[in-house]
Swiss-Prot record:
Its EC number is 4.6.1.1. This is Putative adenylate cyclase 3. SMART domains: TPR. Residues 12-127 form the Guanylate cyclase domain. It holds the Pfam family Guanylate_cyc. PROSITE patterns: GUANYLATE_CYCLASE_2, TPR, TPR_REGION. Gene3D superfamilies: Nucleotide cyclase, Tetratricopeptide repeat domain, TolB, N-terminal domain. One of its GO terms (molecular function) is adenylate cyclase activity. One of its GO terms (biological process) is intracellular signal transduction. It catalyses: ATP = 3',5'-cyclic AMP + diphosphate. It comes from Rhizobium meliloti (strain 1021). TPR repeats lie at residues 343-376, 421-454, 455-488, 490-522, 524-556. Keywords: ATP-binding, cAMP biosynthesis, Lyase, Nucleotide-binding, Plasmid, Repeat, TPR repeat. SUPFAM superfamilies: Nucleotide cyclase, TPR-like.
Length: 587
């Protein structure tokens, strides 16, 4: 290499490497590679951008990143490991991508866009000394960051490392060590058991012999959760939190403690041609004892009848008395066209992928469902959700006409079956975005009447009350939603917003920071944190979080928020952002 082309500078270097990557590749090469690339794109790259770093080399299962600031490098390393832990939460241990991360400060040589020298080499060696899921840093880095960050490192002594003459003094940190977590974001205490019978339905195992049929087992589970949720005498954990255990074999008593329920339903689904076999068993999570087990073997056209039987068995076993309205709604729903049901279930999975392409695919499937069975209210409601989601995210050429379309589809769902809660829920959402808050409030209240365990409906009503300026009521509704869906990070965001509006800044900060641990790419949560810090005089932190907002979403616009968020009193939005101005942020 030509001498004149080499420049030198001091830099902080972050080295990250996947633990046991060769073993993962041997097990499933395609899925492992796809997952790693997704983690780099969706987790690593946004965090590097937020912390003003630059990825300068990829090494198959690892990356090297340059930072101009030691503090930025260390905070990025910790945020990366916290985000990876959250991303791995729903994966079996033998499929999770776990990283080791090392950070070093040293002199580097620069040629074109690549970096060389001891500064880089030591970072790579230090990385190997980190615990899986943890961070190791050199003594030089520690001198710079000590007292400048909330992350507490443990002195791990001197280590001999390959090809480095002198022993290296390292310090280590792991998000698994609760004692080392930054203050204000400790884990939430486990929830208490409700007074009424409480249950969580874990994802049913797919026993069909075809992994591609996993969506069908998920659909059966979701339908059973939905049916149980409509029973006012039960407390039923929402789908998001139940599905946090998908692909795992958790201890039922641990699930019971984590979700705060007494009973847990688990089972399996086997589908062959147009036949279906469901095995289900209910367990007392406080003792681990089995209460009952049953097998259902039917034609696929009787799937609704099977789901009704499962629900009825649970209700009877727990001695829950149905109201007159619930008894009426429990009447047989008759047979279903197998193709229509299959498409309906697949469309739900597509919607959950939450991108423009999957939104288009879900819409196509739902239109086919309604061609087969125009009376399927859930399909109309799902189409309404898609129209709204496209509008909010500006997908698929969305325009304000999407709101009118969403409103019409929600009304069609209600006209088709007025007892279908999702129709009223989607009507509430559409009316909210159209700034018709009083009408939206009535629709959300009706959704809760029909589905008293719907975390989504409580969140919708809470959001409406928040926009109406009724923040105490909103907070109570968000808290109720979070109890029903304790693993869903967005409810923490909404709780934080209500607390911020109420001036309860310390509690709001805790909620927002807990949310960022679970959703590290959220621009909106960072925006509200920046507003909070501005209003409480912590102006440097406010400016820092505002920079992070733009790092995650360069097109973020406060003016767009003013136009889109339907606050009944526009001064509520002014009050939110005044702290940013006080911090010197140009908006």
């Amino acid at each position: 290499m030509a001498k004149e082309s080499i420049r030198r500078r001091l830099a902080a270097i972050l080295a990250a490497d996947a633990v046991g990557y060769s073993r993962l590749m041997e097990r499933d090469e395609k899925s492992t590679h796809t997952l790693l690339m997704a983690r780099w794109k969706e987790v690593l790259e946004p965090l590097v951008g937020i912390h003003q770093g630059r990825v300068f080399k990829r090494t198959g299962d690892g990356v090297l990143v340059e930072f101009g600031s030691a503090v930025n490098a260390v905070e990025c390393a910790a945020a990366l490991q916290q985000a990876m832990a959250a991303a791995n939460r729903d994966l079996p241990e033998d499929r999770a991508i776990v990283l080791r991360v090392g950070v070093n400060l040293g002199d580097i040589m620069v040629e074109d866009s690549d970096l060389f020298g001891d500064g880089v080499n030591v970072a790579a060696r230090i990385e190997a000394l980190a615990d899986p899921g943890g961070v190791a840093i050199s003594d030089g880095i520690h001198e710079y960051v000590h007292g400048r960050t909330d992350i507490d490192f443990v002195d791990s002594g001197y280590h001999e490392v390959k090809n480095i003459e002198r022993p290296v003094h390292i310090w280590t940190w792991s998000p698994k060590d609760r004692a080392r977590e930054p203050p204000n974001i400790a884990a939430e205490p486990p929830p208490q058991l409700p007074a009424k019978p409480s249950i969580a339905v874990l994802p049913f195992d797919n026993m069909s012999g075809d992994p591609e049929q996993g969506y069908f087992a998920d659909g059966i589970t979701e339908d059973i959760i939905t049916d149980l949720s409509k029973v006012s005498g039960l407390f039923v954990i929402a789908r998001n939190s139940s599905f946090a255990y998908k692909g795992k074999t958790p201890d039922i008593r641990k699930v019971s403690r984590e979700l705060g329920v007494r009973y847990v339903l688990e089972g399996s689904v086997r589908r062959a041609a147009n036949r279906i076999r469901i095995n289900a068993q209910m367990i007392d999570g406080t003792t681990g004892g089995h209460l009952w087990a049953e097998r259902y073997d039917r034609g696929l056209e009787d799937i609704f009848a099977v789901q009704d039987e499962v629900t009825r068995t649970i209700v009877n076993a727990l001695r829950v008395k149905l109201t007159a309205g619930e008894e009426e709604r429990r009447e047989s729903r008759g047979k279903v066209d197998p193709e229509a049901y299959d498409l309906l279930v697949r469309s739900r999975q597509a919607i959950l992928q939450f991108n423009a392409l999957s939104s288009m695919e879900a819409r196509r499937m739902l239109h086919r469902v309604l061609e087969i069975d125009p009376g399927m209210a859930a399909a109309h409601a799902s189409l309404s959700i898609i129209a709204l989601t496209d509008f909010i995210n500006q997908w698929n050429g969305a325009t304000p006409d999407n709101l009118t379309q969403a409103l019409g589809l929600a009304q069609e769902a209600i006209d088709t079956d007025g007892s279908e809660p999702q129709g009223h829920y989607t009507l509430a959402l559409a009316l909210s975005w159209m700034r018709r808050l009083d009408e939206a409030e009535h629709a959300a209240e009706r959704a809760i009447e029909l589905d008293p365990n719907s975390a989504n409906a409580y969140t919708a009503l809470g959001t409406i009350r928040d926009f109406q300026g009724r923040h105490e009521e909103a907070l109570a509704l968000y808290t109720r939603a979070h109890r029903l869906d304790p693993q869903f990070d967005l409810s923490l965001h909404f709780q934080g917003r209500a607390l911020l509006n109420l001036g309860r800044f310390d509690e709001a900060e805790v909620a927002f920071k807990r949310r960022l641990l679970l959703a590290p790419r959220s621009d909106m949560t960072r925006f509200y944190l920046a507003c909070l810090y501005g209003r409480t005089g912590r102006h440097e932190e406010a400016r820092g979080y505002w920079r992070e907002v733009l790092g995650v979403n360069p097109s973020f616009s406060v003016d767009h928020l003013r136009r889109s968020l339907p606050y009944q009193d526009p001064h509520l939005m002014d009050r939110l952002v005044e702290g940013l101005r006080e911090a010197g942020v140009s908006i």
